[in-house]
């Protein structure tokens, strides 16, 4: 990460790091351990990431440790395609503990209208407008 951060700095490119728990060495329970993500986010920031993209899990009170522990902004990833109401709750919970935003893929690309979904994400993330989000993200 540090070498890549140095290269990104040369070209004035931001480095977004996504710490992962892929692989078979961790139990399913450990892969959902908020304290592990808090440590991974901190390490990514210390190694030169400009932003960290993490899975959201637990409660806002638990996830606060990820945001507080990380020296750079934290955004949440979208994960698997989900129902709009669940996505809205996840975003609202994450924003309540200080994440800087969302970095979504499948919930945009797999929607019926990706452009409308992006507008809905903007409405919810920037303005707290859940109704517009739910209307646009059917």
Residue ranges and their predicted role:
Residues 117, 135-138:
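Flexible C-terminal active-site loop/helix
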Residues 1-74, 82-100, 104, 123, ...:
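Alpha/beta enzyme core
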Residues 79:
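Cofactor-binding loop segments of dinucleotide-utilizing enzymes, especially the Rossmann-like FAD-
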Residues 23, 111-112:
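Surface-exposed loop/turn and secondary-structure junction residues enriched for glycine/proline
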Residues 106-110:
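A short, acidic, flexible beta-alpha connecting loop/helix-capping segment that sits on the rim
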Residues 87-88, 112-121:
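Histidine/acidic-residue-rich catalytic or RNA/ligand-binding cores of hydrolases
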């Amino acid at each position: 990460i540090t070498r890549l951060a140095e290269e990104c700095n040369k070209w004035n490119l931001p480095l977004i790091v996504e710490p992962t728990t892929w692989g078979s060495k961790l139990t399913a329970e450990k892969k959902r351990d908020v304290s592990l993500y808090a440590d991974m986010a901190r390490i990514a920031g210390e190694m030169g990431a400009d932003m960290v993209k993490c899975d959201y899990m637990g409660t806002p009170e638990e996830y606060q440790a990820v945001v507080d522990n990380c020296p750079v902004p934290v955004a949440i990833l979208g994960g698997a395609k989900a129902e709009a109401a669940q996505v809205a709750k996840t975003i609202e919970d994450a924003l309540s503990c200080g994440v800087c935003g969302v970095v979504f893929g499948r919930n945009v690309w797999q929607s019926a209208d990706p452009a409308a979904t992006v507008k809905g994400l903007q409405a919810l993330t920037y303005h707290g407008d859940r109704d517009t989000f739910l209307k646009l993200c059917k």
